[in-house]
Amino acid sequence: MSVLIKTRHCFVLLGLWLVLPTASAQPLGSLVDIQGVRGNQLVGYSLVVGLDGSGDKNQVKFTGQSMANMLRQFGVQLPEKMDPKVKNVAAVAISATLPPGYGRGQSIDITVSSIGDAKSLRGGTLLLTQLRGADGEVYALAQGNVVVGGIKAEGDSGSSVTVNTPTVGRIPNGASIERQIPSDFQTNNQVVLNLKRPSFKSANNVALALNRAFGANTATAQSATNVMVNAPQDAGARVAFMSLLEDVQINAGEQSPRVVFNARTGTVVIGEGVMVRAAAVSHGNLTVNIREQKNVSQPNPLGGGKTVTTPESDIEVTKGKNQMVMVPAGTRLRSIVNTINSLGASPDDIMAILQALYEAGALDAELVVI
């Protein structure tokens, strides 16, 4: 009897050792996506109104046509050949992602982008419109005030200053879901897990960990991306099984670090552990100065002319001194960025340097531009 008890304790300790996470283990839910449970893209067209003279100009004909069609729906009839010239209106495209499992009445964020030649969408309001999927069906309704992160200022002579992108904005919770997208998650006999970052080692580790946790033949690695899992057929049991599955700790192996750059806002995010090989960096520095003044033209007293004011812009481009920076092998990228910042480089300059380092094979990381 004592031998049997000791044997049972041994199996219990062995099972605990197999389930306990290692130092580099991660929850399976953060490493994979479930096939069939995904977001779907939605798109729509509408008008943004209430702009302070920064809307589409007269040459954008479809904005006037859209405005006339909208007024006609409210019983306002315009003359047939009349082209409404409204500078406070801009034609826009609306895009959104419908997350998996979202039902009727839930809200999602939307992105509003100018189609015509509007200068800015700041302060505008999106009129009610339908958002459709790839099948042409309506899945959501969108409306709300546009939040713009960019700004554009323009002088009388045509010189202007633009910060970020003023013709693209967002509306948090700006769309209401009206139809749920069906999923085959409950109908398939197996559940397929797709690794977010494909790797043969990671796929094999996922299959081994699931077989240890739920029994042999529970999971099979099909490729570097897919892992097939046998799941219960009952809906409630399948949901409970998936909740346990997402918490299983997986040793995903070493993942390559990333450098992410947002081309719209100039934001640079550097992951931990990004290293650089030996290289030399030199980047030109251009400074553009625009000075604007108004000149007054006074006619002769007896000439019968009028006093006019003409704008004059003086644009000066200054090229700064190029400085070569030597980068020793094994240097962390964070130290390089700090050095580049000390030279007065902007985020766009930093991104240009990172792209050059990546193309030269000196950047040991994955470069992602969003």
Swiss-Prot record:
Instruction: Decide whether keyword Signal is in the record.
Output: yes
| One family name in Pfam for this protein | FlgI
MF terms (GO), sorted A to Z? structural molecule activity
Q: Which GO terms describe its cellular component?
A: bacterial-type flagellum basal body, distal rod, P ring; outer membrane-bounded periplasmic space
Answer yes or no on keyword Secreted: no
Q: Which InterPro entries match?
A: Flag_FlgI (IPR001782)
What biological processes does GO assign it? bacterial-type flagellum-dependent cell motility
Give the residue range of the signal peptide.
Answer: 1-25
Subcellular locations according to the entry:
Periplasm; Bacterial flagellum basal body
Alphabetically sorted, this entry's keywords are: Bacterial flagellum, Periplasm, Signal
Organism superkingdom: Bacteria
Regarding protein family, the annotation reads: Belongs to the FlgI family.
Query: Cross-referenced PANTHER family, in alphabetical order?
Result: FLAGELLAR P-RING PERIPLASMIC PROTEIN FLGI (PTHR30381), FLAGELLAR P-RING PROTEIN (PTHR30381:SF0)
Please explain the role this protein plays, according to its UniProt record. Assembles around the rod to form the L-ring and probably protects the motor/basal body from shearing forces during rotation.
Subunit structure of this entry?
The basal body constitutes a major portion of the flagellar organelle and consists of four rings (L,P,S, and M) mounted on a central rod.
Protein name as annotated: Flagellar P-ring protein 1
Organism, by scientific name, is: Yersinia pestis
Q: Which gene encodes it?
A: flgI1
